[in-house]
Amino acid sequence: MAFIELYQATGKHKYEISAREIFTYVLRDITDDRGGFYCAEDADSEGMEGKFYLWTEKEIHNVLTQDEADLFLSYYKHRSDTSMQGMQEIPDGYFIPHLNPSSIDDAEDGLTGFFCKMEGIRKKLFAVREKRVRPHKDDKILTDWNGLMIAA
């Protein structure tokens, strides 16, 4: 709810995008067939924290055309730092793509243009990522947590 309220208060698209992406993830990956929301998804798979979400530039270029890869890498920062407390070090050459909000603010066609350009690119990357070993899902459905999701 925090990102929704931040967007409503500031009108900054980076908060809107964050909220949209969270809801997309939740509805796609941690929602029960009957509509309940699962508790969580683990961070690690195959013995490495975050492995499911890590990419290399080579992987990006192997999946996308040159123009698509250049566009994706211009919008998404290469975040290879381990700023989250307790997170394992990310192996050399791997990174977690993090949207650079200023790249959207600077885009000529704004937020709508960004989503149009990224839709096909993200689908291609998602299809490849879905072939990886997924982290374990905690499929408990807790009433209080579900109430918060419904409120959001």
What does each of the following model-derived ranges do?
Residues 1-152:
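Glycan-recognition and catalytic cores of secretory/periplasmic carbohydrate-active enzymes
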